[in-house]
């Protein structure tokens, strides 16, 4: 009976996260978030957005997601939510999105081992190589506030902002390796962008009174998150319930501690101590990710499926799934409402509202560059410069044909086709992986 309940709850969870991705309300992968405004605004179709989501996510599913679960026996966020990002973006309607997500949840609990064997059976490791896409995407996206400053303000302010943002990254990497440099970098960049914009408005108050007319990109996009708050709250409740069932761990900082806590032979006192340690670790990790998640949500209108991830810490400490579900919904709803207040406040300043196009342009340009660079990394990892040559040839073939595949998605499509061709060449005896 317990297994059936677990299957039902997990299926509901993955179905709902797929639905959130389909509605462009929330996703798990930070790199997919800046892509979805393109989909919402009609600059990209679902096939193109789905190919990017697949390329960004599938490597982590095959490596981190499956390997962590096989090692610990616990489900994890990479395994549950990255595939539903892909399925939700690709689905043509809400019902299909929920259904595909729910099917994935059932498959995880019933067919994980055969799926893992299938993913790792190819002679050329396409899925593992696609993991190379993610690092450039997240690192490049962290620069969007800085690039927006370049577009909107003079060279002096741009130079100062560049020095501050880049030195922040250098200092964090050198002296605080436990912190996420992208989250700090994007936070400092947003502070610089907003500080320069608000200072500009205050200096020109007499010439151009500050008013609240019009919507900034922040208020416009946070309002979209608010419209999806009921769905987000349900996901928060389901995440909490699954974690409270002791079958799920939220991140790498807690999964191995929880494995020990839930293992046989551990006394209740020892187990609770380990659970408390895991909850504290998740809370501290969540603090580090608040700047990244909050600022990207404000800029893109797409939230994270687990919010600021504080819901994980609450889940572990809850006495039962029912209490956990209530607390999870409350925590993630409070986070969303706080975002709305921040978005409305920012909308009072004309220069912040005028930053909308610059922010969009910066995100689009950075994503194009990052996906191109990441795809090159992936192609080289597959087959050295043979893979590079094939991928570049396919990319420029798309250019010569008038871009039947949109420019942002083209590198990812090219590297996936490269992986398929390399496996065909292997089976024909024309290529041997290194």
UniProtKB/Swiss-Prot annotation:
InterPro entries reported for this sequence: Uncharacterised_YhfT (IPR019733)
Record field: transmembrane: 50-70, 72-92, 95-115, 135-155, 158-178, 179-199, 229-249, 288-308, 319-339, 376-396, 412-432
Tagged with keyword Transmembrane: yes
Membrane topology: Multi-pass membrane protein
The keyword Transmembrane helix belongs to this UniProt entry's keyword annotation: yes
Location relative to the cell: Cell membrane
Protein known as: Uncharacterized protein YhfT
